[in-house]
Amino acid sequence: MDKELNNVPYTHGLHEVADNVFAYLQPDGGWGWSNAGLIASEWSSLLVDTLFDLKLTQNMLDSMSSVTSAHPINVVVNTHANGDHCYGNSLVGGENGAQIITTNAAAVEMKAIPPSALEALMKIDLGETTNSYIQDAFGPFEFSDIELPSPDRTFSGELQLDVGGRTVELIEV
């Protein structure tokens, strides 16, 4: 079934935007409310990004289960190192079996600001104005108990993947 991108509503949840290509949307898309993608092939799937915390990521994975039950996620690609694109990696990577792939630069950045740093930042008194800003930006998210697995594979430039017989090209920008 061909989908026209113009006909995809900007509503919360999973939307098929092309044959076996899905967008997971989180309106309003503000700070921390990132989107993710899912590319399903004949027997597996590639997930583009996880979300900012484990609860949000689990809700997303639950909404994808109608696809991933027949096409399990075996690759996760993190587009960059911001937490709202990778802090849910432990739910699919590591012991859960999916290979995590990102750029060399993103892999270095992922180590620089672990989830525990944001958790600690939320507990420090930095004055009313800064505390208010931090609460607005990070208050809706839960950073405790997040263990961020290291990427299994990194690249620079371009990388071509075979995801269950479907070619996916990654391009570092």
List the predicted regions and their residue ranges:
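N-terminal amphipathic/basic leader segments beginning at the initiator methionine
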Residues: M1-V21
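Residue-level marker for the onset of beta-strands and adjacent loop->beta junctions
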Residues: Y10-T11, S34-N35, G157
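Conserved beta-strand hairpin/beta-sheet module of binuclear metal-dependent hydrolase folds
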Residues: H15-T68
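Active-site metal-binding motif and surrounding structural segment of the metallo-beta-lactamase
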Residues: W43-S44, K55-T102
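A mature extracytoplasmic/lumenal domain signature
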Residues: F52, N104, G165-T167
